[in-house]
């Protein structure tokens, strides 16, 4: 269960967020394409486009990079927010909104009290996790003063956001662009 969190985009129809992983099956609920994860870790399917999970993931990375280069990538979702300001606990602080685009991350919430931005060059990767402590998928941004644990309402966006963070960092630092 849960392979759909990593392999979120159907290689047959291109739909995102409609992959469902149950047991050893990974199925697109848009076009019906179905893959089976074998005991040796390979994918098996009629008309299989990918037979290896890393190849599928690399294809998704390339798709995200193309969206970034074309200016069409954007994560825009409501989130539940928890923060870590010390090493004692993580505190739930309510609802907010997270945007990730060519300008980096922008998190708002707390009835206007929270407004945090993070540039694309802040980090070459993103701390993200799936079903984190059985609470949900997370995207974590922040700095040494405060970490923001964002639980997206949109499903299947965590892996894509991580890929986008990594590819955006490469694009911005390679081109020397200032964002």
Q: Model regions: which residues?
A:
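Surface-exposed loop/turn elements that mediate protein-protein interactions on large endomembrane-trafficking
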Residues: 113-119
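Cytosolic/stromal cytosol-facing helical appendages immediately following the last transmembrane segment
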Residues: 122-124
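Non-catalytic terminal regions of proteins
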Residues: 87-93, 97
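Non-catalytic C-terminal accessory region of glycerolipid acyltransferases
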Residues: 1-84, 98-100, 108-110, 126-179
